[in-house]
């Protein structure tokens, strides 16, 4: 496992069989997403796989007020896409095959936190989220938002395959 700046990876072309991107592409505008994916494509060997996990809209997009709330609670100019939007993005960046799975997002749910982080990790996250008044305000705002928008937001996992 290696960590590097995703926009300028310090590796030669065709270096890796697998590149993993965890919940980061959503944080970028569509053009920036394409640039990052092109960089992942560059370092993948022919037949290599890009594995991503991100946020997906279940409809075309959130309402303007809801999108503004999402940006506010995450503190980033987040830009999720639909299932087809994610597929098109990877195909337009040169990948020959895109396998996808999506489902209910458990971000900020007690069950999801325990499953993803383990009991100790979940307790630590909740403790840190509630420790100060500012943390508590932001944590509860995120919790309420993701709970209220659960029908409009899913997780999506993609396995994009570079041609041989």
State each model region's role:
Residues 7-19:
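A short acidic, Gly/Pro-enriched loop at the edge of an enzyme's catalytic core
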Residues 30, 53-56:
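Short strand-turn motif at the edge of the Rossmann-like AdoMet-binding core
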Residues 99-164:
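Conserved Class I S-adenosyl-L-methionine
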Residues 78-94, 100:
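Short alpha-helix
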Residues 34-49:
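A short glycine-rich, Lys/Arg-flanked "PGG" loop and its adjoining helix->strand segment in the class I
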Residues 17-32:
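A short SAM/SAH-binding and catalytic strip from SAM-dependent methyltransferases
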């Amino acid at each position: 496992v290696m960590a590097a700046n995703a926009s300028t990876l310090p590796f030669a072309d065709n270096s890796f069989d697998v590149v993993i991107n965890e919940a980061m592409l959503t944080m970028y505008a569509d053009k920036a997403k394409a640039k990052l994916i092109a960089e992942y494509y560059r370092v993948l060997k022919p037949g290599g796989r890009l594995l991503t996990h991100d946020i997906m809209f279940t409809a075309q997009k959130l309402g303007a007020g809801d999108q503004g709330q999402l940006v506010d609670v995450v503190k980033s100019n987040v830009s999720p896409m639909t299932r087809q939007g994610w597929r098109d993005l990877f195909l337009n960046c040169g990948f020959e095959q895109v396998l996808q799975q999506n489902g209910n997002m458990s971000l900020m749910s007690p069950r999801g936190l325990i499953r993803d982080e383990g009991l100790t990790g979940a307790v630590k996250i909740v403790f840190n989220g509630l420790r100060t008044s500012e943390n508590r305000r932001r944590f509860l705002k995120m919790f309420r938002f993701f709970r209220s928008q659960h029908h409009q937001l899913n997780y999506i996992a993609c396995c994009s395959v570079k041609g041989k």
